[in-house]
C-alpha cells in the first residue's frame, strides 16, 4: 500500500489507479540481477512465489505481463536470464521501431485498453527499461440493474458537486462494516465478483475525509478492516467510472527508500558484466466499472450467508473513495482513488 500512498499524496485531487501486484513482479525481476544495497532495498518488494493462474476462472480474466528490455550491446549473465526466462529481451533503444514493437505487444495483451505505453522516444543512453502491464475483467456476483442507474450528485468537495451516472442495487446482502479510527470514521463494503475476487470500497463519513484515511492505509490496517466485515442487507450506490493512469515510478520508489536502485547508483553486477542502470519504470493502467462487470488493465470472496438483521442500511459513494480489487487469499491486484469524475 505504500506505493499507492506515495502516489496519492503527490497527486492531490486527482484519480489514482495502480496495480501493486504488477509493480511487485517487475521489481522482483530487477532483484534477480541486483547486488549489495540495491538487492537489499529491492527485497522489500520481492514477490512471493505464487501462481497467479488461480486468479483466472470462468467469468474472470486476470493476466499480468512484466518485461525488462536490455540494450542489445550489453552481455547479460546466464544466471539472471535463467531466473526470468521470457520476461527479458534485448533491443536496440536507438531504433524507433523498438518503441512501436513494445507498444504493439502491450496493446494486444491489454486488448486495446493501453496504447501507447511509451508515447515519447527513449534516450539513446537508455540501458534498461522495465515495464508492467495487467489486464483484469470480471462480472459482478450481483450485477447492478441498468434501469436503476441515474444521474446523481457527486461531491468532489464540500462546496463542489458534479453529476455522475450512479449505479444502484437495493436490499441485497453485502459484507460491510462501519469503522471508527482516531484518524477518521468510514464505511467499507465488499462487492464480490463471480469467482474469487472482489472490490473493497472505503468511503469516509465526511466528504473531505479521504486524505487522513489514505495516510493510514497500510497492509495491516486494511486486513484489520476487512476482518471486521459482516453480512448486511444494504442499498449500494456507486458511480460508473473509467480511470486511466500513467506513472513513471522512479521518483516514487526513490522516495520510499529505493535510493540505490535507479540510475547510476544501481548495482546490477548479477545481471550484466557491464554497467547498466534502470532509467525508467513505466506503469500505465485502465479501469472501467459498470453495471455488468469491472474491466481493468495496467498496461469473489465468499459471502457470509447469515445476516444478523433484516434492517436495510445504505452505502452511497457520492464523494471521494478508495477502492481495492483483491483475491480471496488477500493478494491485492489493484488499488485506486476516485475523486474527480471530470478528469477521465
UniProtKB/Swiss-Prot annotation:
Induction: Expressed in the early phase of the viral replicative cycle. SUPFAM superfamilies: Serpins. Keywords: Host cytoplasm, Protease inhibitor, Serine protease inhibitor. GO terms for cellular component: extracellular space; host cell cytoplasm. It comes from the Viruses. It comes from Monkeypox virus. It is found in: Host cytoplasm. This is Serine proteinase inhibitor 2. PANTHER family: GH10112P-RELATED, SERINE PROTEASE INHIBITOR, SERPIN. GO terms for molecular function: serine-type endopeptidase inhibitor activity.
Amino acid at each position: 500500500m505504500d506505493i499507492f500512498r506515495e502516489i496519492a499524496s503527490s497527486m492531490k485531487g486527482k484519480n489514482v489507479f495502480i496495480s501493486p501486484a504488477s509493480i511487485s513482479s517487475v521489481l522482483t525481476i530487477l532483484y534477480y540481477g541486483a547486488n549489495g544495497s540495491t538487492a537489499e532495498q529491492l527485497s522489500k518488494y520481492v514477490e512471493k512465489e505464487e501462481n497467479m493462474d488461480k486468479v483466472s476462472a470462468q467469468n474472470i480474466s486476470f493476466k499480468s505481463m512484466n518485461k525488462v528490455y536490455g540494450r542489445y550491446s550489453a552481455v547479460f549473465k546466464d544466471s539472471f536470464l535463467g531466473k526470468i526466462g521470457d520476461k527479458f529481451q534485448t533491443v536496440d533503444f536507438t531504433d524507433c521501431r523498438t518503441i512501436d514493437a513494445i507498444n504493439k505487444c502491450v496493446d494486444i495483451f491489454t486488448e486495446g485498453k493501453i496504447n501507447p505505453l511509451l508515447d515519447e522516444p527513449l534516450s539513446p543512453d537508455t540501458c534498461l527499461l522495465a515495464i508492467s502491464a495487467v489486464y483484469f475483467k470480471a462480472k459482478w456476483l450481483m450485477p447492478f440493474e441498468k434501469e436503476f442507474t441515474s444521474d446523481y450528485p457527486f461531491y468532489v468537495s464540500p462546496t463542489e458537486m458534479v453529476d455522475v451516472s450512479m449505479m444502484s442495487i437495493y436490499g441485497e446482502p453485502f459484507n460491510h462494516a462501519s469503522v471508527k479510527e482516531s484518524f477518521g470514521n468510514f464505511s467499507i463494503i465488499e462487492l464480490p465478483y463471480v469467482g474469487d475476487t472482489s472490490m473493497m470500497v472505503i468511503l469516509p463519513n465526511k466528504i473531505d475525509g479521504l486524505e487522513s484515511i489514505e495516510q493510514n492505509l497500510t497492509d495491516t490496517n486494511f486486513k484489520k478492516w476487512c476482518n471486521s466485515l459482516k453480512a448486511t442487507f444494504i442499498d449500494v450506490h456507486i458511480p460508473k467510472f473509467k480511470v486511466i493512469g500513467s506513472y513513471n515510478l522512479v521518483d516514487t520508489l526513490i522516495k520510499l527508500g529505493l535510493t540505490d536502485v535507479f540510475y547510476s547508483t544501481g548495482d546490477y553486477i548479477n545481471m550484466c558484466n557491464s554497467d547498466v542502470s534502470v532509467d525508467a519504470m513505466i506503469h500505465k493502467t485502465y479501469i472501467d466499472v459498470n453495471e455488468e462487470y469491472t474491466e481493468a488493465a495496467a498496461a469473489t470472496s465468499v459471502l457470509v450467508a447469515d445476516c444478523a438483521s433484516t434492517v436495510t442500511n445504505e452505502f452511497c459513494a457520492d464523494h471521494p473513495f478508495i477502492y481495492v480489487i483483491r483475491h480471496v487469499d488477500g493478494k491485492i491486484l489493484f488499488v485506486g482513488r476516485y475523486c474527480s469524475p471530470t478528469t477521465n
